[in-house]
Amino acid sequence: MMIRLAASLLLLSAAAPARAIPSKSSIDAAVHKVMASTGARGLALAIIDDGRVRYLHAYGVRDAKGDPLRADTVMYGASLTKTVFAYTVLQLVDQGKLSLETPLAEYLDKPLTDYDTNAIYPDKYGPYRDLAGDPRWKRITARHVLTHSTGFPNFWWGEPDQKLRIHFDPGSRYSYSGEGMILLQFVIENGRKDRGLGLDLGRLTQANFDRLGMNRTSLIWRPDFRPNLADGFNDRGEPVPHDERSKVRVAGSMDTTITDLSKFVAALARHEGLSASSYAEMMKPQLHIGTKTQFPNFAPELPAERQRKDLFAGLGLIVFNGPQGPGFFKGGHDEQTANTMVCIERGRRCVLILSNDVRAEAGFAELVGFILGDTGVPYEWEYGDRAGKS
């Protein structure tokens, strides 16, 4: 026991000291510098310290008319939706309705490949009949989904022939997949009622939003968002209208505000809403990541000596061990959106950035570093040479 305690103290003492949160004026100056250097038109920022929101501000504009971006402006959450989904899935695990290890096939009334998903809900789920010739779908678990190791592509419609297929044995490696998230959504929403499934994920996530006071957040479009809504800007600075998403898709349909989402991130930093065991599972290094960059999908892994040793998939996020100790992060991106969430476990400190301009990505590393110091966030892996590009 004493040896383990001494080792823990040594690791803590070896970590770089946490820097004080900069002053409001210096934060504002840093944001304006990043926006000027990248050309980004709008950016919203939240800073969390000791699990509490300490700073919240929106900068720039929300649309081509020049309407100001505000802390209550509805913005696109993009793939930060996946972390909210993972959190919700782990609550189902806590309730005994799901196991991370049980093959998802066991939660269905019939084989996955027998479902006509377009008849159930058009354009919501994957074309699972495409998997009929590959029995590996029977082995996919919730853990595989949440660690991006199902073997699916990011989305089936990105395949040359637009057919869903499994590219590697489930659980054997990391390759980012929104399609995997959609499979787990399908199982939760259409699974066996005698196992406690057949649940509406829009309602499940909304229950968390309501509990946390996130009144302007939803995984499906709400007309009351329209009066104060952010459009986007692509990498040419061209305005792109906000997509009014008509169905819940856990891979990335969340609309939110910086005020709302900072409440979720703060709750996550406080370990709130999950059992101790489920929180530990979420943050545990589950699957080592050995590629140079996150994209393209199925990229070859680097030689072992060139791989980053501390880079792992957690559940619904990426975990790492940087100069300040263990941390986690998740990004969100589309052609006109750039989001990032970075948290350091020690001190329960986080930075959350939502931008309605994809060009802001190119300044995330600088801005997060200014606020939190050197965290070790693997931005080069996250973006490669694509930061700020549509």
Explain the meaning of each model-derived region.
Residues 114-334:
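Short, surface-exposed loop or secondary-structure junction motifs
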Residues 21-76, 97-99, 120, 158-168, ...:
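Short, conserved catalytic-motif segment at the N-terminal edge
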Residues 36-44, 65-121, 126-143, 166-180, ...:
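Short active-site loop at a secondary-structure junction
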Residues 287-296, 300, 323, 354-390:
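Short, gly/Ser/Thr-rich active-site loops of penicillin-recognizing serine hydrolases
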Residues 32-40, 52, 64, 89-97, ...:
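Sec-exported extracytoplasmic/periplasmic mature domains
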Residues 1-8:
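Sec-dependent signal peptide recognition
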Residues 13-15:
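N-terminal signal peptide c-region/cleavage motif recognized by signal peptidases
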Residues 327-330, 338-357:
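Short, well-ordered beta-strand elements
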